[in-house]
Amino acid sequence: ECDVLERFKVKHQWQTVFSEAHRTEFSLHFWKEFLHDHPSLVELFTRVNGANIYSPEFQAHGIRVLAGLDSVIGVLDEIPTLTVQLAHLKAQHTERGTKPEYFDLFGKHLASHLGDELGTHFDYAAFRDCYDFIASGIKP
């Protein structure tokens, strides 16, 4: 679904937690929790030293992943641009053999992390609707 109001809310809430000042800490906490809960996925990040989330290689990669999501969230209300961005990310993830279920795990953890950050200001339903819309456009 991800209607106009939900898109606005998601953009605003995402900007609150993923602003320039908070991006590194947000990324570190997110990936620490995500890989702790899914240790078998660490092997997906061997190329970027995923065994050490504090390494510069992994921190840069973690921020790149979230920055990719940031770029999509930023154009949620610009459908032609959004369509191109989703197609680009889908091609990248298809080429890398990313399994569709990884997007579901990622989204679940991201929602939990956003809820921790935003507390009672988090609109979980809006996030889920828009994340599901985004993920459906990227999943291989």
UniProtKB/Swiss-Prot annotation:
Heme b binds at residue 93. GO terms for cellular component: extracellular region; hemoglobin complex. It is found in: Secreted. One of its GO terms (molecular function) is iron ion binding. Keywords: Disulfide bond, Heme, Iron, Metal-binding, Oxygen transport, Secreted, Transport. Disulfide bonds join 2-130. Residues 1-140 form the Globin domain. Belongs to the globin family. The giant hemoglobins of worms are formed of a monomeric subunit and a disulfide-bonded trimer. This subunit is monomeric. This is Extracellular globin-1. It comes from Metaphire hilgendorfi (Earthworm). The lineage of its organism: Eukaryota, Metazoa, Spiralia, Lophotrochozoa, Annelida.
